[in-house]
């Protein structure tokens, strides 16, 4: 019921067209990059997918995170407009369920986005690296990994958007967090590994093992629990609707 209600509300906004445009822009980047600098990439002694991800994933991840920011702001802009969220609090609805319906809807919106992006990476692999192994298993694994890495960002961004009646404040906060992630995600510091907005910049390679990924997923799970618990506490103790 709550999930269907969220979809119905978002149909009145530009939410779904925005995600389609974002997916197409993110997918266009590796094609243009490969076409413009083909010789730089095809001669590298790496697997095709690793070459493509090293060259393009930072931009693709940036666009994906920006879609999270835009999507979160759109979801709560509709709630705060004309005090709609206050009316929701008067209805016999579970507010925890409403929030997590938004989380899962935003996460589900990235399934077709990542499918388009991975399909384009597959096309680039076949077109420019036809003589090398395609690594379909790693491609599919990376799609699932990328979707998982977006979940803490979605939770945090929806939490921020739910606290800001002015959409431009939550949008600005999200952009600041995104730009700060861009300054640290390439470093080997602990902050780069645990910072929520830098997680989507990471991707799987053939060298990734469960032992190497275990610390990352421990932080990932901790952030999910932290942001989810923070929202539940706000709903319980805050007097104004969130």
Give the label of every model feature segment.
Residues 32-52, 171-242:
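Terminal transmembrane helical anchor/hairpin motif
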Residues 1-10, 76-89, 143-166:
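Cytoplasmic juxtamembrane interface segments
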Residues 75-107:
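Helix-loop-helix units of permease transmembrane domains in multi-pass membrane transporters
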Residues 1-23, 241:
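Aromatic- and glycine-rich beta-strand/loop motifs that create alpha-glucan
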Residues 23-70, 100-165, 204-217:
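Secretory targeting signals
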Residues 37, 41, 77-80, 84, ...:
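Membrane-interfacial segments
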Residues 18-24, 164-182:
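Pore- or pathway-lining transmembrane helices of multi-pass membrane proteins that form conduits
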């Amino acid at each position: 019921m709550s999930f269907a209600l969220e979809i119905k509300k978002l149909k009145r906004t530009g939410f779904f067209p925005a995600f389609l445009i974002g997916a197409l822009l993110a997918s266009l980047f590796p094609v243009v990059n490969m076409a413009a600098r083909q010789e730089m990439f095809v001669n590298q002694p790496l697997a095709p997918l690793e070459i493509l991800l090293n060259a393009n994933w930072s931009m693709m991840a940036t666009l994906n995170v920006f879609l999270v920011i835009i999507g979160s702001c759109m979801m709560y802009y509709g709630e705060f407009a004309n005090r709609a969220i206050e009316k929701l609090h008067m209805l016999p609805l579970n507010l925890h369920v409403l929030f997590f319906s938004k989380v899962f809807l935003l996460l589900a919106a990235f399934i077709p986005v990542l499918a388009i992006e991975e399909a384009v990476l597959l096309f680039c692999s076949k077109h420019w690296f036809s003589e090398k192994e395609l690594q379909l298993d790693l491609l599919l694994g990376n799609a699932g990994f990328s979707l998982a890495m977006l979940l803490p960002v979605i939770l945090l961004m929806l939490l921020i958007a739910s606290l800001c009646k002015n959409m431009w404040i939550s949008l600005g906060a999200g952009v600041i967090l995104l730009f700060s992630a861009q300054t640290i995600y390439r470093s080997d510091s602990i902050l780069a590994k645990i910072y929520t907005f830098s997680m989507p910049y990471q991707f799987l390679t053939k060298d990734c093992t469960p032992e190497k990924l275990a610390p990352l997923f421990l932080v990932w799970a901790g952030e999910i629990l932290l942001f989810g618990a923070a929202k539940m506490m706000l709903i319980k103790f805050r007097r104004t609707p969130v």
